[in-house]
């Protein structure tokens, strides 16, 4: 809660006039508790889980009906009906209601402990972006090791096998997981803000962006126009799809966001080998077609 009764008091305390965004933030949050602001994450996660994968539903239905977008489908032999995707969404919402939502309600003391602030001044764009980069890097590294644990025999059989029920991922399957996996993967997500605490708005943005990234990674489509193609060392849908395609025995492509951990620790060899093999097959096919096209019958 902002400790100022008026905008004028806040301006005097800061030694300057509030920006337009700071004034809007003051008007909205001044009388609200930090706990109430933190619980906004429940609404944001619900909207992300519900709306962000929705365009992929229409893409999948259009592809199944007419072949449109087929060239971008990573596993084109796998088709999902509307009922298949709605069932996945219902399962995710059940987990959201029973686990994710209650976890948000009871985890506020951890936010107090790491001192996520909600007052003024608001963070600058540079501050927010730098913190988000740090959060993604920390989450990626810690998630890598948690994910490797999930692919131990015990971790997979008892927990992670649920997430791998979708060998060809779809957007709604990104948060589809065992309740224990949801809880354990909250640790890597929380590590960044714990190490470099910022503003509540930055925290909201981090939680939303991380889930949006997971949905893109599980989209099942490799769109060449995706802006994530320009992010250095970004894995993306094609990279993570291989992990699901191989299945429970996969010891490759554990990274959640970037590819550097898999490269450093040698857990991308199967993926690199398959990719190189497919490129050789395509090249051989092109040469064969070119050769056959150049042969003229008498």
From Swiss-Prot:
Organism (species): Arabidopsis thaliana
Q: In which tissues is it expressed?
A: Expressed in rosettes, stems, roots, floral buds, flowers and siliques.
Listed under subunit, the entry gives: Interacts with ACBP1.
Q: At which positions is motif Histidine box-2?
A: 160-164
Which keywords label this protein? Answer: Endoplasmic reticulum, Iron, Lipid biosynthesis, Lipid metabolism, Membrane, Monooxygenase, Oxidoreductase, Steroid biosynthesis, Steroid metabolism, Sterol biosynthesis, Sterol metabolism, Transmembrane, Transmembrane helix
Primary location: endoplasmic reticulum
- Which prosthetic group or cofactor does it need? Fe cation
About its domains, the entry says: The histidine box domains may contain the active site and/or be involved in metal ion binding.
Top enzyme class of this protein? oxidoreductase
A single GO BP annotation from the record?
fatty acid homeostasis
What InterPro entries has UniProt attached to this entry? Fatty_acid_hydroxylase, Sterol_Desaturase_Related
Can you tell me where the transmembrane regions are? 42-62, 96-116, 118-138, 189-209
Gene designation? SMO1-1
Provide the protein's localization: Endoplasmic reticulum membrane
Q: What is this protein called?
A: Methylsterol monooxygenase 1-1
Catalyzed reaction equations: 4,4-dimethyl-5alpha-cholest-7-en-3beta-ol + 6 Fe(II)-[cytochrome b5] + 3 O2 + 5 H(+) = 4alpha-carboxy-4beta-methyl-5alpha-cholest-7-ene-3beta-ol + 6 Fe(III)-[cytochrome b5] + 4 H2O; 24-methylenecycloartanol + 6 Fe(II)-[cytochrome b5] + 3 O2 + 5 H(+) = 4alpha-carboxy-4beta,14alpha-dimethyl-9beta,19-cyclo-5alpha-ergost-24(24(1))-en-3beta-ol + 6 Fe(III)-[cytochrome b5] + 4 H2O
> What job does this protein perform?
Acts as a rate-limiting enzyme in the sterol pathway via interaction with ACBP1; sterols serve as lipid modulators for gene expression of homeodomain-leucine zipper IV transcription factors. Together with SMO1-2, involved in the maintenance of sterol composition to balance auxin and cytokinin activities during embryogenesis.
Query: What membrane topology is given?
Result: Multi-pass membrane protein
Phenotype of the disrupted gene, per the record: Proembryo abortion in the double mutant lacking both SMO1-1 and ACBP1 associated with altered fatty acids (FAs) and sterols profiles. The double mutant smo1-1 smo1-3 shows no obvious phenotype. The double mutant smo1-1 smo1-2, which accumulates dramatically 4,4-dimethylsterols, is embryo lethal, with embryo exhibiting severe defects, including no cotyledon or shoot apical meristem formation, abnormal division of suspensor cells, and twin embryos, and is associated with altered auxin and cytokinin homeostasis.
Record-linked Pfam families: FA_hydroxylase
The entry's other comment says:
Requires a membrane-bound cytochrome b5 as an obligatory electron carrier from NAD(P)H to SMO.
* Motif position, Histidine box-1: 147-151
Where is the secretion signal located?
A: none
Task: Tell me the ranges covered by the Fatty acid hydroxylase domain, including all copies.
Answer: 132-267
- Per UniProt, what is one GO molecular function of this protein? C-4 methylsterol oxidase activity
């Amino acid at each position: 809660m902002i400790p100022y009764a008026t905008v004028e008091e806040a301006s005097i305390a800061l030694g300057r006039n509030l920006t337009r965004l700071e004034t809007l933030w003051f008007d909205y949050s001044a009388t609200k508790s930090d706990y109430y602001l933190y619980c906004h994450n429940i609404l944001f996660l619900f909207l992300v889980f519900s709306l962000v994968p929705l365009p992929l539903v229409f893409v999948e239905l259009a592809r199944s009906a007419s072949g449109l977008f087929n060239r971008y489908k990573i596993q084109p032999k796998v088709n999902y009906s509307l009922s298949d995707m709605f069932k996945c969404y219902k399962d995710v919402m059940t987990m959201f209601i029973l686990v994710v939502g209650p976890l948000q309600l009871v985890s506020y003391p951890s936010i107090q402990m790491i001192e996520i602030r909600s007052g003024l001044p608001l963070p600058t764009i540079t501050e927010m972006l730098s913190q988000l980069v740090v959060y993604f890097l920390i989450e990626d590294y810690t998630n890598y090791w948690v994910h490797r644990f999930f692919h131990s025999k015990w971790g997979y059989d008892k927990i992670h096998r649920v997430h791998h029920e979708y060998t060809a991922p779809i957007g709604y399957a990104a948060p589809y997981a065992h309740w224990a996996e949801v809880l354990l993967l909250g640790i890597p997500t929380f590590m960044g803000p714990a190490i470099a605490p910022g503003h509540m708005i930055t925290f909201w943005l981090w939680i939303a962006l991380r889930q949006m990234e997971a949905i893109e990674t599980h989209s099942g489509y490799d769109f060449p126009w995706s802006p994530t193609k320009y992010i250095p060392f970004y894995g993306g849908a094609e990279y993570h799809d291989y992990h699901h395609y191989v299945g429970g025995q996969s010891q490759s492509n554990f990274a959640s966001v970037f590819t550097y951990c898999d490269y450093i620790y040698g857990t991308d060899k199967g993926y690199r080998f398959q990719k190189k093999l497919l490129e050789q097959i395509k090249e051989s096919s092109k040469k064969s077609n070119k050769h056959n096209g150049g042969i003229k019958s008498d």
